């Protein structure tokens, strides 16, 4: 939360070479870009779904090529040499951006924190896992002022080690190295973040100006932050360090802190530990008039080569630097780990003051402590200072007891900060099986751990026998398909959570999710558990099958049967190796955010859902990591299989449900059907025979979008063609296997 929230800009210069700019800091107005580009389809039709969202990182954009294997390259890396080089950079001040106290540690901590800290629990977006801080809008957020300099300082290291270390890993690793170089013992570190090569469209907020808040709060008088946002303010990581909407109220700020850190999966103790620990190092920057700070990197003149916020206040750097507009040094030891942040926080009474840039902050009252805080460049000593949000840790009952305890027990703070910092840096990386490097600690509860395989796996003969038992069990194709989808369809590609591995469909909270039809699971799971138990009790050589594997295998057997019933023999690939997690290794509260509000693949939406269903379908497809064609074929196939939630007939455009046919597409595109909104059922459409007026089908927007949206209609036409019935089956099976294996990182 070390929030150097800086300067912004007014309208852009009219010529490419014009370098003058005006800016305001710390209150930053919106950029006003001028563009001669033609209007896009989204400009003309903003409510139309954008299928291109499902293809955010095309292979052609990757200069390393499709065959590049980051894990293979990383294995060649000398991580100790890398750490030594990062620390060397950190302790070698550069004239073009001089280091406070001769050490860039505070800057690097902030860079890593602000990369990882964009993570949000409601949709798993954000985080440092792809190196997105290099690109717009994050590289130009007001909260990220001067982090462009931090990344430039690291360029010699990246240049030296090349493909063996990604930018995503290096940005996060640098902050970890900073802590260690200043005497802090970290909990561990994992590499494994792969770079992307272009920005991704993420809804960070609907405000059209920096530091805006009006669109993310409902205006009902309640300060209830809308989902899925993780920050109170457009362009900030968490909260305004001057207080809500710049009002210096530490108690109100504490409420915002709790909400935003909670949306990053941090509890109160973890939140307090991160703030205290992070603010034990470095300083903020607000040396003078913020109007003298130039435009952000994306708006800076071309000759600045991607560096932004050039300041004409004095030298613009070092003692004259302006970043957040706040001028705070928290401790007398800003390059050393100790307990002086809390000793300072509780050792003085505080009064509200303003920085040289006009930002609200607190200073020790009545001149107390004058001269005890060192100047970063050898000038006269300073008075103790704190952010409004620092005072929250003392004044708010939410955090007071926690920080008071740490004042007397610094070893507890060190342990809490080490674990919270590790969680911050790795929250978006998924299972430990994805982690690389020698410093990976034991799996933590928040990482949704699954036990290792400790037995021989089933072979092809076992798989065939188990399929026969499943199909002879009395369970129907829709039941088996829906159960497998309920397990695997919980996966989120954003933060690599959910999925079938772990068998958590049988555990709380997933067992009772409305989307998963608990009453149906109560029928299906006991049957599968009996098959599992019988096999494990009788199999030779100690072979076993987990329920997680059997759920997927059963769904795949149902798909094979459905394809056969449609006239196609096909084998659905199955890779055993999933294991069953325990309820004790499942954080119920943490998993609750994975519960789907809607799943268009099952034609499910919670009652009263107001968002357009087709948009929610697209979002679910995005989270699953499927493409436009894969989304299309999956919806059509699942409708044919009768896999709708609650057995609904919406979108089941076939007279032979349970067979894997392309009837959904054929009948959707039939011009003999005329569609209209139902007069009796909300969010339902009726398809009537155009000649007789007889009711033929019912549907939701999840179905009709494949005939309405021009891109999806083009895909639907492919699968409706007479010569593509076999292709439809093959493509459905391939997409099905992809979803079933999304969380099988051991296979990738």
From Swiss-Prot:
Pfam families assigned to the protein according to its UniProt record, in alphabetical order: peroxidase
Cross-link (Tryptophyl-tyrosyl-methioninium (Trp-Tyr) (with M-264)): 113-238
Domain of life according to the entry: Bacteria
Catalytic activity: H2O2 + AH2 = A + 2 H2O; 2 H2O2 = O2 + 2 H2O
This enzyme's EC code(s): 1.11.1.21
Primary role: Bifunctional enzyme with both catalase and broad-spectrum peroxidase activity.
Molecular functions (GO terms): catalase activity; heme binding; metal ion binding
GO biological process, one term: cellular response to hydrogen peroxide
CC cofactor: heme b
Membership in a protein family: Belongs to the peroxidase family. Peroxidase/catalase subfamily.
Xref: InterPro entries: Catalase_peroxidase, Haem_peroxidase, Haem_peroxidase_sf, Peroxidases_AS, Peroxidases_heam-ligand_BS
Annotated region (Disordered), positions in chain: 1-43
Cross-link Tryptophyl-tyrosyl-methioninium (Tyr-Met) (with W-113) per UniProt, renumbered positions: 238-264
Binding site for heme b: 279
Provenance organism: Mycolicibacterium paratuberculosis (strain ATCC BAA-968 / K-10)
Protein name: Catalase-peroxidase
GO cellular component, one term: cytosol
Gene name per UniProt: katG
Keyword entries, A-Z: Heme, Hydrogen peroxide, Iron, Metal-binding, Oxidoreductase, Peroxidase
List of catalytic residues: 114
Quaternary structure annotation from Swiss-Prot or TrEMBL: Homodimer or homotetramer.
Enzyme class: oxidoreductase
Biased composition (Polar residues): 1-16
Annotated site, Transition state stabilizer, chain positions: 110
Cofactor notes: Binds 1 heme b (iron(II)-protoporphyrin IX) group per dimer.
């Amino acid at each position: 939360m070390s929030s150097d929230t800086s300067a912004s800009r007014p309208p852009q210069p009219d010529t490419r070479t014009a370098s003058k700019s005006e800016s305001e800091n710390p209150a930053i107005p919106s950029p006003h870009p001028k563009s001669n580009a033609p209007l896009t389809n989204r400009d003309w039709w903003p409510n139309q779904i954008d299928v291109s969202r499902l293809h955010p990182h095309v292979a052609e954009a990757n200069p390393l090529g499709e065959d590049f294997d980051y894990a293979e390259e990383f294995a060649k890396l000398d991580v100790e040499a890398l750490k030594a080089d990062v620390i060397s950079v950190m302790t070698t001040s550069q004239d073009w951006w001089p280091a406070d106290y001769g050490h860039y540690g505070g800057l690097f901590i902030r860079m890593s924190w602000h990369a990882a800290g964009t993570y949000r629990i409601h949709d798993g977006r954000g985080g440092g896992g792809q190196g997105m801080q290099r690109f717009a809008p994050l590289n130009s957020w007001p909260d990220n002022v001067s982090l462009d300099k931090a990344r430039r300082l690291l360029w010699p290291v990246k240049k030296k080690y090349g493909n063996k270390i990604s930018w995503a890993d290096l940005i996060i690793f640098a902050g970890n190295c900073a802590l260690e170089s200043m005497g802090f013992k970290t909990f561990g570190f994992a590499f494994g973040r792969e770079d992307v090569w272009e920005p991704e469209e993420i809804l960070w907020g609907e405000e059209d100006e920096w530091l805006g808040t009006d669109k993310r709060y409902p205006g009902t008088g309640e300060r209830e932050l809308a989902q899925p946002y993780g920050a109170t303010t457009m362009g900030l990581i968490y909260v305004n360090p001057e207080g809500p909407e710049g009002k210096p109220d530490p108690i109100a700020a504490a409420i915002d802190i709790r909400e935003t850190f909670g949306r990053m999966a941090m509890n109160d103790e973890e939140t307090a530990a991160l703030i205290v620990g992070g603010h034990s190092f470095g300083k903020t920057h607000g040396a003078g008039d913020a109007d003298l700070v130039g435009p952000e990197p994306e708006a800076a003149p071309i000759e600045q080569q991607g560096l932004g916020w050039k300041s004409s206040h004095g030298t613009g750097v070092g003692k004259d630097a302006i970043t957040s507009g706040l001028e705070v040094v928290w401790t007398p030891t800003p390059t050393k780990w100790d307990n002086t942040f809390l000793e300072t926080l509780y050792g003085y009474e505080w009064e509200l003051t303003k920085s040289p840039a006009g930002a609200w902050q607190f200073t020790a009252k009545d001149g107390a402590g004058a001269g005890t805080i060192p100047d970063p460049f050898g000038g006269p000593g300073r008075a103790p200072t704190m952010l409004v949000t620092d005072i929250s840790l003392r004044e708010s009952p939410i955090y007071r007891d926690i920080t008071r305890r740490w004042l007397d027990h610094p070893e507890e703070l060190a342990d809490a900060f080490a674990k919270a910092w590790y969680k911050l840096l790795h929250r978006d990386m998924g299972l430990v099986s994805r982690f690389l490097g020698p410093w990976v600690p034991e799996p933590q509860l928040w990482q949704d751990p699954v036990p290792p395989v400790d037995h021989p796996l089933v072979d092809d003969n076992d798989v065939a026998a188990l399929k026969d038992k499943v199909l002879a069990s009395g369970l129907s194709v829709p039941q088996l398909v829906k159960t497998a989808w309920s397990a695997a369809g919980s996966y989120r590609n954003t933060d690599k959570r959910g999925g079938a591995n772990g068998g958590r469909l049988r555990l709380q909270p997933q067992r009772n999710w409305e989307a998963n039809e608990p009453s149906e699971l109560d029928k299906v799971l006991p049957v599968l558990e009996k098959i599992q138990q019988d096999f494990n009790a009788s199999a030779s050589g100690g072979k076993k099958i987990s329920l997680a594997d059997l759920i997927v295998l059963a769904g795949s057997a149902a798909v094979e049967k459905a394809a056969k019933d449609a006239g196609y023999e096909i084998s659905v690939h199955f890779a055993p190796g999933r294991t069953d997690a325990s309820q004790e290794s499942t954080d119920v509260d943490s998993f609750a955010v994975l519960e789907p509000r809607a799943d268009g693949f099952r034609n499910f939406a919670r009652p009263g859902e107001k968002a357009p269903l087709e948009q929610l379908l697209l979002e679910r497809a995005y989270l699953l990591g499927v493409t436009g064609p894969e989304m299309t074929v999956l919806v059509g196939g699942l409708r044919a299989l009768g896999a709708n939630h609650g057995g609904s007939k919406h979108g089941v455009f076939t007279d032979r449900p349970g067979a894997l046919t392309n009837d959904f597409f054929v009948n959707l595109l039939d011009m003999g059907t005329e569609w209209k909104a139902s007069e009796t059922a909300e969010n339902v459409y009726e398809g009537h025979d155009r000649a007789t007026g007889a009711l033929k089908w019912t549907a939701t927007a999840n179905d009709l979008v494949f005939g309405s949206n021009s891109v999806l209609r083009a895909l639907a036409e492919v699968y409706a063609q007479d010569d593509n019935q076999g292709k439809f089956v093959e493509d459905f099976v391939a997409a099905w296997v992809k979803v079933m294996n999304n969380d099988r990182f051991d296979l990738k």
